[in-house]
Each structure stands twice: as C-alpha cells, then as structure tokens.
Swiss-Prot record:
Record's keyword terms, sorted: Nucleus
Protein name: Uncharacterized protein C645.12c
Ranges annotated as biased composition (Acidic residues): 187-198
Keyword Transit peptide: no
Single GO cellular component term: nucleus
Statement: the UniProt record of this protein carries the keyword Methyltransferase: no
Main location: nucleus
Segments for region (Disordered): 15-69, 172-198
Native organism: Schizosaccharomyces pombe (strain 972 / ATCC 24843) (Fission yeast)
Compartments in which it is found: Nucleus
Compositional bias (Basic and acidic residues): 37-49, 56-69
Biased composition (Low complexity): 176-186
Length: 198
C-alpha cells in the first residue's frame, strides 16, 4: 500500500512540476532571496549586476528544453484495472484520498462554525458593554441584590438536597437493620395496603 502511495505521489509531483524543480516553496524562495541579498551586499553594484546576469544565463542553460517530459516512475501497466493487484491499490488510494478530503471539509466546517460563534460572542460582549454603560447606579444595586438572592437560594436548595439525601440514607439503614424476615415484612405490607385501601 505504501508503494502505491509513493507511486501516486511521484506522479502528482511530475504533473505539478515539483520533480523537475520548476516550483519551489515560499520558504525556499525567501531563503534564497535573503542569501542572494546578503551575498550581493558585499559586492559593488557592477559586480552584482554581472553576477545576476551570469546566474540567469547559467539557469537557462541548465534547464531542460520545455518539450522534453520526464519519464514516469510508475510502471506502464499500473492503471490497468484488469490486473487485480493494481485495481486493489488504486481503490485503496482512492478511498484514502476521499477520506482525506472528508476530513479537510469537516475541519473547514468546524473552523467556520467556531469563527461564527466567536463573532457572535464578540457582538454580544459589545452589546452588553453598551448596555452596562447606560445603567444608573440604582440599577446596579438592584442587580446586585438579585444576584445575592440567587446565591442564597442556590445555597438553600443545596442544603435541602443534602438533608433529603441524609434522611433517605438513614431510612434505608433502618429498614436494613429491622429484625423482620422477608416473609413477615411482605405480609405486613399486604395488611397495611388492605387497611388503608391502597
């Protein structure tokens, strides 16, 4: 599988011209420019012009003619689907390619959603700041009182839940410690339900 990937990568490089050195990354171009700039600073203007012209001439003379094409690294019958091995490799590569495209699309959608959410949050923050600036001191007092009441009610709810949990826990432990057998307790429950009409 890795050999098929390598072959497809080589074909892609040949198609894009990277194999022949026609394209270079932006970082490589920046590095080359800085190297050229530093080397030309030390030389006089006339010498730098002469060097630039000679470099240009050398590059043109070393480049292959545009009509010649690079020989493909793939075997001639690689895309022949009648060969089972080739067909499987092509299908695997195609599936991997589609999966990569799907992942890229998902990432793009996620980034777009997060960007929209950040913009909405920024807009809400701006609106809240504007609204907060327009409030009078009495309104701040009212908001503070409401906030403190909410905090007190939250504490009360938490304490009530804690007490309820403790009482349930105690009731459960009392039921476990009773001396009645299961049959006696079931019979007493039946009697109680009959008496109370439940």
């Amino acid at each position: 599988m890795s050999s098929a990937r390598e072959l497809l990568r080589k074909v892609k490089q040949e198609r894009l011209g990277q194999k022949r050195g026609l394209k270079a990354s932006s970082q490589e171009l920046k590095r080359q420019k800085t190297r050229d700039h530093k080397s030309f600073e030390n030389l006089g203007r006339d010498q730098s012009r002469e060097l630039a012209v000679s470099d240009f001439n050398e590059k043109q003379s070393t480049e292959p003619p545009k009509d010649t094409r690079a020989v493909s690294a793939l075997p001639e019958n690689f895309f022949d689907e009648s060969i089972a091995k080739n067909k499987e490799l092509i299908e695997e590569e195609w599936n991997d390619f589609q999966n990569e495209i799907g992942i890229i699309e998902e990432n793009a959608v996620e980034q777009e959603i997060t960007l929209q959410q950040q913009q909405l949050l920024a807009e809400k923050d701006e609106e809240n700041e504007i609204a907060d600036n327009d409030l009078e001191p009495e309104v701040y007092d009212i908001l503070y009182e409401e906030e403190s009441k909410l905090g007190e009610s939250r504490d009360l709810i938490r304490r009530l839940k804690q007490k309820r949990f403790e009482t349930k826990k105690n009731n459960f432990s009392v039921k476990e410690s009773s001396n009645l057998s299961n049959n006696d307790s079931d019979a007493s429950l039946d009697e109680d339900t009959l008496l109370w009409g439940l």
